[in-house]
Regions:
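Structured, contiguous alpha/beta core segments that scaffold functional sites
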Residues: 1-175
Length: 175
């Protein structure tokens, strides 16, 4: 008779990040030190298996990419650097890695239509408690670095730069 041994994992070692707003800050911290996204990137970059799993899933989700026809031809080039297809692929990886993604939507000067769409590195975005304002920082680890704020994407208020923000639903977790 053969025996089967199961390797166990100490689940208590793996903790989900805390999301909380400090009294003197407008944004919600992403982890106890507000650097949890960098931890996720580090895992992604240092583990060949983890990297292969996520990039493999990204490839499957992306498939043949976006097929843009008709009126969407206007968005084939979402901005001067990226096509909408390239932005879509970046958002897929952010969704898999962080559980969310963010887009910067820039309205034309007249306020009639979207002029440009940019992918925003999700690791550099924080939100306020009710997800109506977003904060971008290239270096969250540096307390002196500049934080830029944006309003939530609102097709009724067609002005300036706004953020379209998607985050996976997690029961009992705010923002």
């Amino acid at each position: 008779m053969s025996r089967i041994n199961f390797a166990g994992h100490d689940i208590d070692k793996y903790k989900t990040p805390d999301f909380y707003q400090e009294k003197n800050k407008k944004y919600v911290n992403f982890g106890s030190d507000n650097l949890y996204p960098l931890y996720l990137v580090d895992l992604f970059n240092r583990s060949a298996k983890h990297n292969a799993i996520l990039t493999g899933k990204q490839t499957y989700v992306y498939g043949s990419g976006l097929k843009i026809e008709g009126v969407w031809d206007l968005f084939a080039n979402a901005n001067r650097f990226d096509s909408l297809d390239e932005i879509f692929n970046k958002c897929i990886l952010d969704k898999l890695l962080y559980g969310g993604y963010a887009l910067q939507i820039i309205w034309d000067r007249v306020g009639e239509s979207i002029a440009e769409i940019y992918h925003m590195d999700f690791s550099k975005i924080r939100s306020n408690v009710d997800n109506t304002e977003f904060y971008f920082n290239n270096e969250w680890a540096d307390p002196k670095s500049k934080i830029k704020s944006y309003k939530v994407f609102n097709p009724e208020k067609k002005q300036g730069a706004q953020i379209y923000y998607y985050r996976d639903y997690r029961p009992a977790v705010t923002t």
